[in-house]
A protein has these predicted regions:
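Glycine-rich beta-strand-centered segment in the early N-terminal region that forms part
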Residues: 22-37, 51-100, 113, 132
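C-terminal hydrophobic helical "lid"/dimerization subdomain
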Residues: 162, 220, 243-248, 256, ...
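Adenosine-nucleotide cofactor-binding segment
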Residues: 175-177, 181, 192-270, 393
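Rossmann-fold NAD(P)-binding glycine/threonine-rich loop
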Residues: 269-272, 276, 288-308
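Helix-to-beta-strand junctions that scaffold the AdoMet/dcAdoMet cofactor pocket
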Residues: 278-280
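NAD(P)H dinucleotide-binding glycine-rich loop of Rossmann-like/cofactor-binding domains
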Residues: 95-177
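Short N-terminal strand-loop motif that marks the start
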Residues: 1-66, 400-425
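Hydrophobic/small residue at the entry helix of a nucleotide-binding pocket
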Residues: 186-187, 214
Length: 425
């Protein structure tokens, strides 16, 4: 099977590549990858090349396919797997294999990654339960289950303690104060959505950022009134220019501090502020992944000793987290499409991956069977004045107030003749 992929060839070197895939073995799957949402971690891998923990050497001869937030359709089933999978079945990939090497789809394999028209899912990923049946029909939601799974996993990874009781109570504190720092970006939107609609029931959620435009957008998507209807106080704060942001934020809790803090940017000042905002037994989750292996900040160990403050770090999520993300999206409790601001085809991947930090907006969603420059959803109407494809896409997203949706996805895929398979039984 001939495939077209976006692959890392070295530091800051991402190219389109077209080649013939080898025949699958009896324990492998050949799949068509319909959609892949671009992760900032992919950009980090492209920036570092083989210096990245998950990226192997010899990229020049064996370039690795980018992308891991993906979903698609099974095209061919190895003969030993016919009792478990079938041709035409839709799937979602859970890329976190937990291997000692750190290797995973989108970083480490020549034939296994989400930015591909076709890829081979290897035996090890299948044995680890990484191929999940998808019962839905909206591939964007399936792709976005992976970033939502990471967000959900972070909430589950936080923990709290009782003095002299040597057990960790996993999860955020019920009825507690949550602070989401640097959290008005695409992943932050998902984090706010889960805090309000995921059933974890904090009493207060404070969203902190320094970008008025991003804060205004997320407030439209997840308004204060929506949270209030669920018994949650939601507060949006721009700390830019504040003389004492720590005092201002602590005042929102009556100077008690925050029980759970999530840091969504690897910026030393943000991490230091998080430390100062912790309540007694407060848990700081360093969600943002730094590229600097020597990323260090001062930390108050007096509070660690006397106030039981503590730190966790999370990267990725479990299969159960993925299943939770899919289920909550299917019922409409979570709206992962809120995160999407740009749509593009496979041809847009190299530039998108290499320039991701400089492209404004939220998640960039790629459809591998489509040829289309990366385009902001907000620009569809203008482009539609001269292009009938964008004219219809603009009409379809207007029905959901500018949010990407299943009807727009189906129309786009149909225009390029993409086979979308059938829902898993």
């Amino acid at each position: 099977m001939k495939t077209k992929v976006a692959a890392i060839y070295g530091k800051r070197d991402v190219r389109l590549r077209e080649f013939e895939l080898p025949e699958i073995t009896d324990n492998e799957l050949l799949v068509s990858v319909i959609s892949d949402s671009v992760c900032l971690s992919t950009g980090k891998a492209a920036l570092l090349g083989s210096e990245h923990k998950r990226v192997p050497d010899d990229l020049e001869n064996h370039p690795v396919i980018t992308g891991h937030e993906c979903a698609g359709v099974i095209v061919e089933v190895g003969k030993n797997l016919t009792g478990k999978y079938k041709k035409g079945q839709r799937f979602v990939l859970q890329p976190a294999m937990g291997l000692p090497s750190g290797y995973s789809a989108g970083y480490s394999y020549e034939y296994f990654g989400g930015n591909a028209t076709y890829m081979i899912i290897p035996e090890i990923a299948i044995n680890l339960g990484c191929v999940l049946p998808y019962h839905g029909s909206y591939f964007a939601a399936a792709s976005l289950a992976e970033p939502m799974c990471c967000i959900i996993g972070a909430y589950h990874a936080n923990y709290h303690t009782t003095q002299y009781v040597y057990e960790h109570r996993m999860g955020v504190k019920p009825g507690g104060n949550i602070a989401l720092l640097a959290c008005a970006g695409p992943m932050g939107i998902g984090a706010i959505d889960y805090a309000i609609n995921g059933g974890i029931q904090p009493s207060r959620v404070v969203v902190v950022d320094i970008d008025d435009k991003r804060l205004a957008q997320v407030q439209k998507l997840l308004p204060v009134d929506l949270a209030a209807s669920k018994g949650i106080e939601l507060v949006y704060v721009n700390t830019k220019g504040m003389s004492d942001p720590v005092q201002t934020l602590r005042a929102l809790t009556g100077d008690v501090g925050f029980d759970d803090i999530f840091v969504y940017a690897a910026v030393p000042a943000v991490v230091e502020m998080a430390d100062e905002l912790l309540a007694e037994d407060g848990c700081l989750n360093f969600f943002a992944g730094p590229t600097d292996k020597n990323f260090k900040v001062p930390f108050n160990f007096y509070n660690v000793h006397y106030n039981s403050t503590h730190v966790v770090g999370t990267s990725g999520g479990s299969t159960d987290d993925m299943k939770e993300a899919i289920a909550l999206s299917a019922t409409g409790q979570l709206q992962p499409s809120f995160m999407v601001t740009h749509i593009g085809g496979l041809d847009a991947v190299p530039d998108t991956v290499l320039n991701l930090p400089d492209i404004p907006g939220g998640k960039k969603l790629i459809y591998n069977g489509v040829t289309m420059p990366l385009t902001a959803i907000a620009d569809f109407a203008e482009k539609g004045k001269t292009d009938p494809l964008f004219k219809e896409l603009a009409r379809l997203v207007e029905e959901t107030h500018g949010i990407w949706n299943e009807q727009a996805e189906k129309y786009l895929l149909a225009q390029f003749g993409v086979d979308i398979g059938e829902a898993a039984q």
